[in-house]
Structures are given as structure tokens and as C-alpha cells.
A protein has these predicted regions:
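Active-site and substrate-binding clefts of carbohydrate-active enzymes
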Residues: 75-78, 226-456, 472, 501, ...
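C-terminal (or distal) subdomains of carbohydrate-active enzymes
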Residues: 199-202, 218, 228, 253, ...
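Active-site beta->alpha N-cap acidic-glycine motif
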Residues: 30, 40-45, 52-135
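Conserved short loop/turn motifs at secondary-structure junctions
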Residues: 121-126, 155-160, 184-195, 217-220, ...
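CE4/NodB-like, metal-dependent polysaccharide N-deacetylase domain
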Residues: 167-205, 270-290
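Metal-dependent polysaccharide deacetylase catalytic core of the NodB/CE4 family, i.e.
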Residues: 73, 79, 110-190, 238-247
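Surface-exposed loop and adjacent secondary-structure segments within mature catalytic domains
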Residues: 138-146, 196-260
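Extended acidic/polar, glycine-enriched regions
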Residues: 2-69, 515-566
């Protein structure tokens, strides 16, 4: 009510009946009116009288839902975002202690206002059970059984950088927690707008029935127009009841619960429910997530309990209650399970691009994870052969997995890293984060050495130096491996002759020379499934094999003809002889392997999800370096420089055409400048496969991009696991990337 007189008592009438006595002050007055509910849109005539002032208006009163709102309090686990990684565990352990105390402090509250708490991540709970006294653990278990505290299944919040093995390792904590008699029926992922598809299958195996996804639309799109509950179907056909919730701190960002101001909370909540209803949210029940305070890694508080108690004293409905997430899910499943749609598809995450800011460590982590998988296969071979494994080997594997988990959890920067890119907290967070990648690399290498030592014990020593290659996969393998061979065995100037026991020499090619050793590439043939092959090493003269250097700019074998453009260091023609097919789109503005630097004119474009102020640039300079011919591949190498690379020779691209397989490798490296302004660079792959469709491997399976995924999930870029492909009815081109996962298709 806008009133411009002196303060005055006022009466408000509806359809002639007095419904409110109030006081009007000069200016804007907000007045809550209590009106009986209606079953259909109903016209209400309102009248206000305050002394000589009066006004009339008519409004249409619509039917309203008898809302039941459940408030789910949690602390978002963001390791290193609000303070150093070294502080976060102690904080979250303390929060569980506080949660127990707050349960005690609100035991005399009405049940719907009693303090309740959801432990968002299982990591702090797992550690809590290891370090707290038995009496405190008993308190925790008691409150869990009462439904006052809830334990969930996600170890951390993960995007798609971790592979299936890492995600499986993250769930070991659930087993330890359940061994204590603690139920884990729900997984909660917050602040990440996607999740590995394989987790759906994993959760089903663990008895986890529900998945709560607390979104965050900053620089990302959100799936679905409204909060949506659905049956998410896994690659194997299993189903998980899943809720795409609102922002994981809607209670703080929208409702301002942390202020404790009942009037502010009341107005914000009513406006939120009006908005939710206008979007055709179909149910009367809703869950709203919040933290004790408006921050990640927030301590719990009893503010919500006090607000809910005040609200319920004022209103019959909407009914508010504190709740665990599982209670909301179980109620919805009981009342509406047949109303939820079934959606089968991957859920790619928008925020994985953050790992592009730590490309070196991300690549190292991917290599470490795949190497650890191979090493575990080697340990299985050893155990199958009757070799006793070391007592500490499982602990070593757990420590390697732990490093992988801490690197791949979703936090990629300190909260002030954009404003203070070189500040002490930013640099500390960065250093600690990247240390996990190198720790994983180191621990994995040690496990590999231990594995080889065990397997070696089953083999006799040969008169001549020998090499044993193990295949830990369950199918026969041919392909490339590399090995360092000391000059004591193969002198400098000689070639490594690698012979099988039938006297057949394998194709080899030198890769790197040092004073004491040479690294050799070896092309292996038919190493048995879950088996091995043994080879003899002896020096042969260099002149027995071709290893020439030339300045030709064309590469050709029986499958492909590759024509390069020395002026740009790119490929202008990639001709498939078998199919008489040109593989490159000749009309594309970018050539195959072309370097593209993209720089933004302003950072705000990322927040507003637009791109209208940017510059794309090729390399500043590029030059031909060399061409080499070898037994395994022939290659052309170019060097270049860019504004984003160090000098000299900041960028390298090598094109390798293989002689033993229908395969082309394009290897790129950059000595990157440290730049804090928003930028990115790309390597172009403009393939021309007629009517081709894009496919990519995600954690959990292979999808057709844009089709086999939840609508609204990331499609500007994909986090490739091992490969992507373009295929039509007759042709398939497969791209593998061991280190770099981000591709735009």
C-alpha cells in the first residue's frame, strides 16, 4: 500500500468483511492478509480505510498448494576453496561434533524444527570414525538411527576428470561406514552440474537408492527448467531415483536464512513459492538445501530451526520442517513414484573446463590412473602365478588412489583466485592441488616397480639381455611400447635388436638419447591375453635398418597419404587410399592440426554466457624443423611461437605416420606462459566424414554426443575418457588422447 499521509490506524476489508487492522506509515507498506483458500480463481474486492484515506482494488485469488517444504542443511565440501586444503578436514570433523551438540540443543523443539544435518560427503565421516572416541561415535550412530543426521555416498564432489576406476575407489569409504552399522541410502553431489554415468551402476550395487544433485548455474547451463525428480537409468538398465535440485544453497542465496530475520525469510519464501508455482512445478512437496551460513565449507547452525519454529507458530501452511535428504526422497517415492519420467543418458559436466588451467597435472593424473590399473593387473598376474603379494601392497594402492581422489575432486582454485591470482592463498591452494597429481604419479611408479619385481621372480635369467612384456588385458594385443636401454647393453651408434624366440626381429625406432641410455620405441605383435612375451636384446648395426632424415613435406604409407603445409605447420590433405576418401574438410577455415589462440576482451562474457568480444589468432611464427623416417613411423616436426608460449620454440607439433598400423599420431606440446587473463587454445581437427555422427566415451559408456545425454548437460565440450569417434554407415575415425581430456565436437 502506498500511503503519503501521517501515520494512521487502518482497516482492510475483503468483499465487505473486515480482515485486518494495521498501521500505515508514510510511503510503501507491505501487509500480509489472511484469506480463506479457494478451489478456483475467485475475484476479491479489497478496500483500505485510514482516516480520510481510502482505496479500493480487486484481485484474483488463485488456488494455492498446501506446500510441504523440507529444509536440508549441509556443508558444501570444497577442498581448498575457502581456506587451505590442510585445514578443511579439521573443519568438517568439527562440524560433525557441532551437529551432535545442536541435536542435543534442539531436542525440546517441535519435531519439525529439531536440528537435522546431512553430511554431504563421506570423506569427513570416514575420517571421523577413525579418530573420534567411541563415546562420540556412539552419539553419532544414535542420531543417525533417529533420522537427525544423515550419511551420504559421495566421497567428494566429482566432475568427469576421474575415470571409472577412480570413482569406484572413492566408494570404498561407503563400505567402511556401512560396516559400522550406519545406513547409506543416498548420494549427494553439489556444485557440479553433471556426474559420471557409471556411478548409477555403482550406487545400485551398494544399495544407494537416491541421488540428490544440488546445481550451480554460474558459467553453466542447468538441466531442466524446474527442479525435477526422475528415474535415471544406467548404461546397464538399472535405475536411481534422482532429483535435480535447485542451487545447493538456495536457502541462503534466495531465502537469506542465515540472517535469522523471520520477516525477510517469510517474504523471500513466499515469493520463491509463487515463482516455483508459476513455472508449473507439479508437486506440493519441495526440498530446499542450505548451509548454516552463506559460504562453502560452512559450519552448521541452529538458525534454520529457530526460523522454522517461528514460521510454524504463525502459519498452518505452508508446512516447514527440517529434514534429511533421504526423508524427502522416500516421501516422494511413496507418493509419486509412478509420476516420475525415466531418463537414460549421460550427464556431462560443464565445469570440467576448469582443469584446462592445470593441463600438465591433469595429463599426469590420467596417465597415473591408467598405469595404476595396469599395475594392478600385473599384481593379479603375480597372485595367479602363486606369488605372495607384499603385506603393504594394498596400502600402497590405497595411497595412490587417495592422491588421485584429491586431485580429481572438483575444486580447481581458491575463492579469490580471480581477484588475487598471485596471492598467497591462491598459490598455496594451487601448489597443494598439483602436488596430488605428482604424488599419484610417484606412488603409481613405485607400485609398478614392485609389480615387475614380483613377476620377474618367475623367470629364468637368459645368457643375453632380455625384455619381458606383459599384457594385463583380456585380449591379444599388438601395439607400441617404449623402453630405456642402457648403452652398456646397446652402445651408442648401434640399434637395439629386439628378437622373439622364433628369431623374428621387431620394428624399433630411437626416441631419445642421453649419455648413458637411449629410449627405444618397439612395435609389439600378438602379446597373449593376460599373458606375456619374452624377447632377446642384442645390438645390430644402424645400417641394417632405415632411419633417415630428409626435408620432404609428404608422408605416405599403404593406407594414407599426408600432405603438410610448411607455412602453417598443418596438414592440408589426409587421403585414405583404401576408401579413396579425403578425410579433411577442404572448405574449413582451419587446417588439420592448426593452433588457435582465443583471448577474451572481457571476463564478464563467461558469467553472462555469451561470446561477442574475443580474438582468435594462429601461431605468430612457424617453421619446419625436420623429417625422419624409421621402421615404426615417419614423421615431420614443426616448431612455432605464440603470444601465450615462452620463447624459443614454445610450441611443437610432430606428425607421425605409422608403417605397421593404420594410424596417424599428432603430438603437440607447449611451453606455456603463466597468464591470468581468460584465454584458451585449441588444436583443430576439421574432419570431413559425410553424414558423420560424433561419439565419445564418458565414465560409464560410449554416447552419441548431443543424443545419449540429459538435455541441458554439457555439449560445448566433452571430457573424453579414452577416445572420441566420428562415424557414418561405412567409415569410423577414432581419436585417442591419453593426456588431454577436453574436446569440442
Amino acid at each position: 500500500i502506498f500511503y503519503f499521509g501521517k501515520q494512521s490506524d487502518a482497516k482492510i476489508y475483503a468483499n465487505g468483511n473486515l480482515i485486518k487492522n494495521t498501521v500505515l506509515n508514510f510511503g510503501y507498506n507491505a501487509v500480509n492478509l489472511g484469506l480463506p483458500p479457494v478451489a478456483k480463481p475467485t475475484k476479491i474486492d479489497l478496500k483500505v480505510i485510514a482516516g480520510d484515506f481510502s482505496m479500493k482494488n480487486s484481485v484474483t485469488l488463485d488456488p494455492v498448494k498446501k506446500w510441504k517444504i523440507k529444509f536440508i542443511q549441509h556443508s558444501h565440501t570444497d577442498i581448498g576453496y575457502t581456506r587451505s586444503q590442510t585445514d578443511i578436514l579439521a573443519e568438517h570433523l568439527r562440524y560433525i561434533d557441532y551437529a551432535l551438540d545442536y541435536c542435543d540443543a534442539t531436542d525440546n523443539y517441535p519435531d519439525n524444527a529439531k536440528f537435522r544435518w546431512t553430511c554431504e560427503a563421506s570423506w569427513p565421516v570416514d575420517e571421523y570414525l577413525k579418530c573420534r572416541p567411541a563415546s562420540q561415535i556412539e552419539r553419532l550412530i544414535k542420531r543417525i538411527k533417529e533420522g537427525r543426521i544423515e550419511i551420504t555416498g559421495m566421497y567428494f564432489n566429482f566432475d568427469e576428470i576421474p575415470d571409472e576406476k577412480i570413482l569406484a575407489a572413492s566408494l570404498q569409504a561407503v563400505g567402511r561406514i556401512k560396516d559400522k552399522g550406519i545406513p547409506v541410502k543416498l548420494a549427494m553431489q553439489d556444485d557440479v552440474n553433471g556426474i559420471g554415468w557409471c556411478l548409477n551402476d555403482y550406487f545400485n550395487q551398494l544399495g544407494v537408492k537416491y541421488l540428490d544433485m544440488g546445481t550451480h548455474g554460474h558459467r553453466a547451463l542447468i538441466c531442466f527448467d524446474i527442479p525435477t525428480m526422475f528415474w535415471w537409468e544406467s548404461p546397464s538398465g538399472k535405475r536411481l531415483l534422482t532429483f535435480r535440485a535447485e542451487h545447493y544453497m538456495t536457502g541462503n542465496t534466495v531465502l537469506e536464512m542465515q540472517t535469522g530475520d523471520i520477516e525477510r525469510f517469510k517474504n523471500n519464501l513466499l515469493n520463491y513459492l509463487i515463482s516455483l508455482n508459476s513455472k508449473q512445478y507439479p508437486f506440493d512437496e519441495m526440498a530446499i538445501q542450505h548451509s548454516g551460513y552463506l559460504t562453502d565449507n560452512s559450519p552448521p547452525s541452529t538458525i534454520a530451526s529457530d526460523l522454522i519454529k517461528q514460521w510454524n507458530d504463525m502459519f498452518v501452511w505452508p508446512q516447514l520442517s527440517t529434514s534429511t535428504a533421504e526423508t524427502f526422497f522416500s516421501d516422494m517415492e511413496r507418493d509419486h513414484s509412478n509420476d516420475f519420467p525415466v531418463i537414460r543418458g549421460a550427464w556431462p559436466d560443464w565445469w570440467t573446463d576448469g582443469f584446462g588451467a592445470s593441463a600438465r597435472e591433469t595429463g599426469t593424473t590420467r596417465i597415473a590412473s591408467s598405469t595404476l590399473t595396469a599395475n594392478e593387473g600385473g599384481l593379479s598376474m603375480a597372485a595367479s602365478a602363486g606369488i605372495k603379494l607384499p603385506n603393504e601392497i594394498n596400502k600402497s594402492i590405497d595411497l595412490a588412489d587417495n592422491a588421485l581422489l584429491f586431485y580429481t575432486e572438483h575444486t580447481t582454485g581458491y575463492s579469490e583466485s580471480v581477484r588475487e591470482p598471485l596471492g598467497q592463498p591462491t598459490m598455496e591452494q594451487r601448489a597443494l592441488k598439483e602436488s596430488y597429481a605428482w604424488e599419484a604419479n610417484r606412488r603409481t611408479a613405485s607400485i609398478g616397480e614392485e609389480t615387475m619385481g614380483l613377476l620377474q621372480s618367475k623367470f629364468t635369467r637368459e645368457e643375453q639381455p632380455s625384455l619381458i612384456v606383459f599384457n594385463t588385458l583380456n585380449w591379444k594385443r599388438s601395439g607400441l611400447t617404449t623402453v630405456y636401454i642402457d648403452h652398456q647393453i646397446i652402445p651408442r651408434g648401434k640399434t637395439a635388436g629386439i628378437f622373439d624366440y622364433d628369431g623374428n626381429r621387431l620394428a624399433v625406432q630411437s626416441v631419445l638419447h642421453r649419455s648413458d641410455v637411449t629410449q627405444w620405441a618397439i612395435w609389439l605383435k600378438d602379446v597373449p591375453a593376460f599373458g606375456y612375451k619374452k624377447y632377446i636384446i642384442k645390438p645390430i648395426d644402424d645400417n641394417q635398418i632405415s632411419n633417415k632424415v630428409s626435408d620432404n613435406k609428404v608422408l605416405e604409407n599403404k593406407w594414407y597419404k599426408i600432405v603438410t603445409n610448411p607455412a602453417k605447420g598443418t596438414i592440408v590433405s589426409w587421403f585414405d587410399k583404401e576408401q579413396s576418401l579425403e578425410m579433411i574438410d577442404q572448405k574449413n577455415e582451419y587446417q588439420m592440426g592448426e593452433f588457435i589462440l582465443e583471448q577474451l576482451g572481457n571476463r564478464s562474457q563467461m558469467e553472462s554466457r555469451r561470446l561477442d568480444d574475443f580474438k582468435r589468432s594462429p601461431l605468430d611464427t612457424i617453421w619446419f624443423d625436420s623429417m625422419a623416417e624409421g621402421e615404426i613411423w615417419n614423421s615431420i616436426k614443426f616448431y612455432g611461437e605464440s603470444a601465450t608460449s615462452e620463447k624459443p620454440k614454445g610450441f611443437m607439433i610432430e606428425i607421425r605416420l605409422f608403417n605397421n598400423e593404420k594410424r596417424l599420431d599428432i603430438t603437440c606440446s607447449i611451453i606455456k606462459k603463466s597468464i591470468v587473463s581468460p584465454e584458451s587454445f585449441y588444436i583443430a581437427f576439421p574432419f570431413d566424414i559425410k553424414n558423420g555422427k560424433h561419439f565419445t566415451e564418458v565414465p560409464g559408456g560410449v554416447i552419441e554426443a548431443g543424443k545419449d545425454q540429459i538435455k541441458g548437460s554439457s555439449n560445448d565440450w566433452y571430457t573424453i575418457q579414452d577416445f572420441a569417434a566420428v562415424r557414418n554407415e561405412s567409415t569410423q575415425l577414432v581419436i585417442g588422447s591419453a593426456e588431454m581430456p577436453l574436446m569440442q565436437l
